[in-house]
Amino acid sequence: MSFKPIDPKRDEIRRYLERGSVLDSLTKLFIRVIKERPENPMDYIRNHIGVVRHQHDKYERLQQDLQLANEEIQRLRAIINGINPDVLQGHQPVASSEVVVATEAPQTVAESTEAAEQQQQQQQQENGETELEKPNESSADVAEITAAVEACQIEGNSVVTTDEAAQPSPTVQAEASGSSE
């Protein structure tokens, strides 16, 4: 057998088709035709030629959704971290046992907040400290903020890194292969 050099034009076309993932798509399609053995292979190829591209588009859309969700998480964390800790300082945290039915919860929170304010005022008077009341701040507002902060339990590392997002998960692959049938 003699060795034939690869025609440069052929090699250029092959690289072009590989770059556009055309060869990969066609190979997968031909493998499915061989496995399923449809009655009319040409119709099957015509109907399923864009499925691989659809899967790629779906994967890109999911990556964009993940990125938007991560940005939203970062934005909300900044808001939570931006809450003035001085406003919340000295108030008793709302325990999960104190959370009652929705109609009773505001009263319980308000009562515990008032008790905490009285304790704080007594401590300040004993220590000789005086604090001016803030006119725009009511005990209900403070109680609401305290309850909201206590209810927000953000995990430390819940944001998916870009490297993790770049790896397709087995469930996405299974879903994509299951939808093409």
UniProtKB/Swiss-Prot annotation:
It is found in: Nucleus. It comes from the Eukaryota. InterPro entries: AMY1. The keyword Nucleus applies. Keywords: Nucleus. Signal peptide: none annotated. One of its GO terms (cellular component) is nucleus. The keyword Cytoplasm does not apply. Residues 111-145, 159-181 are annotated as: Disordered. Residues 111-127 have a biased composition (Low complexity). Its main location: nucleus. GO terms for molecular function: transcription coactivator activity. GO terms for biological process: regulation of DNA-templated transcription. Residues 168-181 have a biased composition (Polar residues). Belongs to the AMY1 family. This is c-Myc-binding protein homolog.
